[in-house]
Amino acid sequence: MAHPIQWKVIAMYDSNLDNIWHVEIKFVEDDTHTHATVRAQLRDGQAMTTHGDAYRNPNDSSQPMVGEEIAAARALIALGTELLQAASARIEQVTHRPVHLQG
């Protein structure tokens, strides 16, 4: 049976400590699958949502924390990729040149 788990993880600050980004990770799990949803609320009011999954081999022992770590890591990597793409687009709007940021 799937059960949601809510876990608030990060509050990131800029150099002036004035602006806060809220990043929330929610989990839904069953016997062999963990799904993580990451939602980041940015300082400009924009929200980004990404997802990550982890699957356990049915022959392996159940270790829910491991599934959560893997699913969360995959969702956070996806969030990082989206943030880099958004930053690239903002830079391109100003410079009118292609930008390729790497993680």
Question: Language-model segments: what does each one mean?
Answer:
Residues 1-2, 40-45, 76-79:
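Short, structured coil/loop segments at alpha-helix boundaries
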Residues 2-35, 84-103:
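C-terminal binding/interaction regions
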Residues 22, 55-56, 67, 99:
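Generic preference for well-ordered secondary structure
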Residues 33-64:
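A short, structured beta-strand/loop element
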Residues 54-56, 75, 79, 91:
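Generic helix-packing signal
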Residues 59-60, 72-74, 86, 95-97:
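Short, intrinsically disordered/low-complexity patches at protein termini
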Residues 61-64, 68, 89:
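Flexible, active-site-adjacent loop/turn segments at secondary-structure boundaries
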Residues 65-81:
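Short, well-ordered alpha-helical segments
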